[in-house]
């Protein structure tokens, strides 16, 4: 196999997984659906030509994102939640339908329904009572959002109708904000000075995936208000062995009789042409529907054909999503500004008159680089054509030349970094993008890296978001930022946070907000006015307590507490937070599991790094290059000095985690459900640290299954195969003392 094919496949895998993590974990869309599908199809082609490239965890074999946040307990779906394959033209849809009818050996009926742009949810009912609600996650395990789901008016807690109800049934659907409710939400956010949501899907995901714990009464009321604006429509079933109906449309009728909300827009058609006509009509009236839609889902209506046609590892063959081309509007290009991201890339952004497109208001869009600006032919002051690529990402298509009046002017790419003044330059010869080479101290790059450290894919620090990162790295006062680099992050003190003042900026344009008198608005995020309950200022007190006027705010105290807790986060999260190029959650987990410590990773050769399953040559080169830079090593030294743990306790050493050297040497253990005292990732790391293999599925080779509440098919499989099942307490004994310390199994 050619080395370039392997390198291309590794690069595609890394990028696709990064995009999935951004979409499913961070509620962020980085590329259009068409571009994502192009990358996925290319990876499928490479794996077809070179079967040895395909692995079980390849993006071509998996669904969704990894349910890796620590905010919610993991829930295993009784039946996998698959994704859908996409088509973008009538020709592609007709080709899919022709294959369906060829494989079925007869003409089929098609159920067509509007594709809701929302958050996929799985509702589990037992004997008619809602027991759990979970996000899709990776299709096998999602996040438990049951308590939040109960606040959504459309979701029934107990099925109605005559019954009898099945012992267990999973109902799948989409949670979304109706267009009107989304507009109300953003209006409230703007009035409160809060960041507005980019689109309704982000808002739905962000509202559903929040915790009430730690919030004050006002915050909890706001949270319940958001949840109360959400709606849900169900569009399928999961685990239900023998539904008493013969068609998918019949399933919907049954679900409606149980009091569950289904779409009023679905129709069954007997020919491909009728289905195609429905797709066309729905596109014309998409703005009249209560919720955002980005296409039509077409399903074979007959349930028996679902079994006959089957599914791939990630999508059913009996259904397809027809994705609409994005909507286009005209608006005024007011300016082109350049921003610098955490990698140093200088990116021009179009600042426009606010305009509504594809369901949300837009004021800015990326222009990528100076060559793209030139190729599009846009001038500052132009009326431009704007669309949302994939109905999500704002994209300037070009100018309306006939509307020019002579006042327009060309954009000139700055020669120096707008943030630190360093001359911009390509990273290497031939690159189009310009970058700021001052990676260590450029405040915009430091801000981006600090924000990445706090992200869900990094250390998952709730108090270290966009606002806190900007305050720590680019304050108005003091002149010297508390964090000139991220090296000092874990050494921050209340005294460092207390004096910080920041300019309040518009969440969309990044421009300073002004008071009525035209002065920039200023905020002090880490202090508040002293109140009677705080007591008098004591300058002799040992603990820092502010000054006579103010005390540290809750945000300051929470940030420091979160940072203390983050010092002992799993090694793979620490690795991601170091901002090593190409080292996302997948590669970081592989490196952490294999080597067990940062010292061992640092000491490894290129061949040793590249040989690790899930790493490869591209990541290996990036890791070695990262450690060659002196200030990177200073970050590690400072973090270690401030208590960050760069090793998995008890790990037997490089390559020995699953081959010997621990109490679970040679044993395979599966953890499923909510194990008390363990997150999903912590349970897996405990198995690996003890020398065992942490498997994701149960088989005859499995030695133990640790199961907590919410365990599903894995528990049933273990009982079927006679594999010993442990509770959380027994699991702790197993990983700490080994199987010999477990109590005898009662006969």
UniProtKB/Swiss-Prot annotation:
Family as reported in the entry's similarity comment = Belongs to the NAD-dependent DNA ligase family. LigA subfamily.
- Quick one: which residues bind Zn(2+)? 417, 420, 436, 442
InterPro entries according to UniProt: BRCT_dom, BRCT_dom_sf, DisA/LigA_HHH, DNA_ligase, DNA_ligase_AS, DNAligase_adenylation, DNAligase_N, NA-bd_OB-fold
Q: Return the NCBIfam families for the record.
A: dnlj, PRK07956.1
E.C. designation(s): 6.5.1.2
The UniProt entry, under Gene3D superfamilies, shows:
5' to 3' exonuclease, C-terminal subdomain (1.10.150.20), 6.20.10.30, BRCT domain (3.40.50.10190), DNA ligase/mRNA capping enzyme (3.30.470.30), Helix hairpin bin (1.10.287.610), Nucleic acid-binding proteins (2.40.50.140)
The UniProt function text for this chain reads:
DNA ligase that catalyzes the formation of phosphodiester linkages between 5'-phosphoryl and 3'-hydroxyl groups in double-stranded DNA using NAD as a coenzyme and as the energy source for the reaction. It is essential for DNA replication and repair of damaged DNA.
Q: Which GO terms describe its biological process?
A: DNA repair; DNA replication
Please report the name of this protein according to its UniProt entry: DNA ligase
Q: Which SMART domains match?
A: BRCT (SM00292), LIGANc (SM00532)
Source organism phylogeny = Bacteria, Bacillati, Actinomycetota, Actinomycetes, Micrococcales
The protein's matches in HAMAP family, at most eight in alphabetical order, are given as:
DNA_ligase_A (MF_01588)
Is Cytoplasm set as a keyword in this record?
no
Q: Which residues form the BRCT domain?
A: 659-747
GO cellular component annotations, sorted alphabetically? cytosol
What keywords sit in the KW lines? DNA damage, DNA repair, DNA replication, Ligase, Magnesium, Manganese, Metal-binding, NAD, Zinc
User: Required co-factor?
Assistant: Mg(2+); Mn(2+)
* GO MF entries: DNA ligase (NAD+) activity; metal ion binding
Q: Which domain of life is it from?
A: Bacteria
Catalytic center residues: 115 (n6-amp-lysine intermediate)
Provide the residue positions that the database annotates as binding NAD(+).
33-37, 83-84, 113, 136, 174, 299, 323
What is this enzyme's catalytic activity, as reactions? NAD(+) + (deoxyribonucleotide)n-3'-hydroxyl + 5'-phospho-(deoxyribonucleotide)m = (deoxyribonucleotide)n+m + AMP + beta-nicotinamide D-nucleotide
């Amino acid at each position: 196999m050619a080395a370039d094919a392997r390198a291309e496949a590794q690069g595609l895998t890394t990028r696709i997984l990064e995009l999935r993590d951004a979409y499913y974990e961070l509620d962020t869309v980085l590329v259009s659906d068409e571009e994502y599908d192009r990358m996925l199809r290319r990876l499928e082609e490479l794996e077809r030509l070179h079967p040895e490239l395909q692995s079980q965890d390849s993006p071509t074999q998996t669904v969704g994102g990894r349910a890796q946040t620590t905010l919610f307990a993991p829930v295993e779906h009784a039946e996998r939640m698959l994704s859908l394959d996409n088509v973008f033209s009538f020709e592609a849809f007709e080709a899919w339908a022709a294959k369906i009818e060829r494989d079925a050996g007869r003409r089929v009926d098609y159920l067509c329904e509007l594709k809701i742009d929302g958050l996929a949810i799985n509702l589990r009912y037992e004997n008619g009572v809602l027991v759990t609600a979970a996000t899709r996650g990776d299709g096998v395990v999602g996040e438990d959002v049951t308590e939040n789901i109960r606040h959504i008016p459309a979701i029934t807690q107990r099925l109605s109708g005559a019954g009898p109800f099945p012992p267990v049934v999973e109902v799948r659907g989409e949670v979304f904000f109706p267009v009107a409710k989304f507009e109300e939400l953003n209006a409230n956010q703007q009035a409160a000075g809060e960041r507005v949501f980019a689109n309704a899907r982000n808002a739905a995901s962000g509202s559903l995936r929040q915790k009430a714990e730690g919030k004050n009464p006002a915050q909890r009321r706001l949270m319940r208000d958001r949840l109360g604006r959400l709606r849900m429509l169900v569009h399928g079933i999961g685990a239900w062995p023998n539904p008493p109906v013969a068609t998918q449309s019949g399933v919907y009728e049954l679900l409606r009789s149980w009091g569950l909300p289904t779409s009023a827009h679905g129709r069954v058609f007997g020919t491909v042409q009728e289905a195609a006509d429905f797709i066309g009509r729905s596109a014309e009236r998409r703005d009249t529907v209560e919720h955002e839609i980005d296409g039509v889902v077409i399903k074979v209506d007959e349930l028996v054909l679902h079994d006959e046609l089957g599914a791939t590892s990630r999508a059913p063959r009996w259904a397809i999503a027809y994705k609409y081309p994005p909507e286009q509007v005209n608006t005024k290009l007011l300016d082109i500004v350049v921003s610098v991201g955490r990698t140093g890339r200088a990116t021009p952004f179009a600042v426009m008159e606010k305009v509504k497109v594809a369901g949300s208001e837009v004021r800015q869009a990326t222009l990528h680089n100076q060559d793209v600006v030139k190729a599009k032919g846009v001038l500052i002051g132009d009326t431009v054509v704007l669309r949302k690529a994939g109905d999500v990402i704002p994209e300037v298509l070009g100018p309306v030349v006939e509307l020019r009046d002579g006042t327009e002017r060309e954009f000139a790419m700055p020669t120096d970094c707008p943030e630190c003044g360093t001359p911009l330059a390509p990273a290497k010869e031939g690159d189009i993008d310009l970058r700021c080479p001052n990676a260590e101290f450029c405040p915009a790059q430091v801000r981006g890296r600090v924000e990445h450290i706090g992200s869900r894919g990094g250390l998952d620090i709730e108090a270290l978001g966009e606002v806190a990162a900007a305050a720590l790295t680019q304050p108005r006062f003091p002149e010297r930022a508390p964090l000139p680099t991220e090296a000092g992050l874990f050494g921050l003190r209340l005294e460092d946070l207390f004096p910080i003042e920041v300019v309040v900026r518009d969440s969309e344009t990044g421009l300073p907000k002004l008071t009525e008198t035209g002065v920039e608005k200023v905020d002090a995020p880490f202090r508040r006015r002293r109140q009677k309950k705080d007591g008098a200022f004591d300058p002799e007190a040992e603990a820092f307590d502010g000054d006579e006027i103010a005390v540290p705010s809750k945000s300051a105290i929470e940030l420091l507490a979160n940072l203390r807790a983050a010092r002992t986060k799993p090694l793979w999260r620490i690795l991601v937070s170091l901002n090593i190029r190409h080292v996302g959650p997948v590669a970081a987990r592989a490196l952490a599991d294999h080597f067990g410590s940062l010292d061992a990773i640092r000491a490894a050769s290129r061949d040793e790094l590249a040989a690790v399953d899930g790493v490869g040559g591209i990541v290996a080169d990036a890791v070695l290059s990262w450690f060659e830079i002196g200030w990177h090593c200073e970050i590690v030294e400072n973090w270690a000095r401030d208590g960050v743990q760069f090793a998995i306790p008890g790990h037997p050493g490089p390559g020995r985690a699953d081959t010997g050297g621990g109490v679970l040497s040679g044993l395979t253990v599966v953890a499923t459900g909510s194990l008390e005292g363990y997150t999903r990732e912590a349970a897996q790391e405990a198995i690996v640290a003890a020398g065992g293999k942490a498997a994701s599925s149960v088989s005859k080779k499995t030695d133990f299954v640790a199961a907590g509440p919410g365990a599903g098919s894995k528990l049933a499989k273990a009982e079927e195969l006679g594999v010993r099942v442990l509770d959380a307490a027994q699991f702790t004994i197993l990983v700490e003392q080994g199987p010999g310390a477990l109590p005898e199994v009662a006969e």
